[in-house]
Amino acid sequence: MVDVITIPATLRTEFGKGYARRVRANDKIPAVIYGHGAEPLHVILPGHEMMLASRNSNAVLDINVDGEGHLAMIKEVQRHAVRPEILHIDLLTVRRGERVEVEIPVHVEGEVAPTAIHNVEENVLVVEADALKVPEYLTVDITDLEVGEHVYAKDVTLPGNVTLVSDPELLVVNVSEPVEQDLGEESETEEEGAEGEKPAESTGEEPGDDE
């Protein structure tokens, strides 16, 4: 399950692009907290801490503004087109016990049968879970699966507090036969091509002579 990350914040009292640039120059990030019908709360967040927290899109943050905590999840991160810089963050307020719809990464474990290979067709699944009990990933066990077998979204084991939102028939893992490349034929073709080439006739002139 994800941990709640406490982030210190200050209220934003000025607005405009110029002010936002000055904020980012001081390794801070402008952000807004909204949701549940409350007035949007504009804040300034610490850049390094938020850069780390934003690596997990389902992280639950406890934004501490003047001693008051605000539980929130990252809704959107606006990044610079070229530089590794966060320009702005939208945070969605959540409440303890509230269920949220999130995308969870799929982790494959185990090895298929020796005569087979597996292909991951879907890297994430959409689920509904308690905001404070969102799993970091969903495990898909492919141990000893044979050629022609499949794992669908409905086959993935979910924690007790999690329900599937994605299409149950969504293909997650496909087990197939390895595709063999006939290197013998390719080698013969190359040899035939080489035998068919005729050496270029010498003109007696050095390359680059235009006289």
UniProtKB/Swiss-Prot annotation:
Annotated keywords: Ribonucleoprotein, Ribosomal protein, RNA-binding, rRNA-binding
A Pfam family this chain is assigned to: Ribosomal_L25p
Gene Ontology CC terms: cytosolic large ribosomal subunit
Region (Disordered): 175-211
Gene Ontology MF annotations: 5S rRNA binding; structural constituent of ribosome
SUPFAM superfamilies: Ribosomal protein L25-like
BP-aspect Gene Ontology terms: translation
Keyword Plastid: no
Known function: This is one of the proteins that binds to the 5S RNA in the ribosome where it forms part of the central protuberance.
Similarity field: Belongs to the bacterial ribosomal protein bL25 family. CTC subfamily.
Name the record gives this protein: Large ribosomal subunit protein bL25
Organism: Kocuria rhizophila (strain ATCC 9341 / DSM 348 / NBRC 103217 / DC2201)
UniProt lineage: Bacteria, Bacillati, Actinomycetota, Actinomycetes, Micrococcales
Gene name of the record: rplY
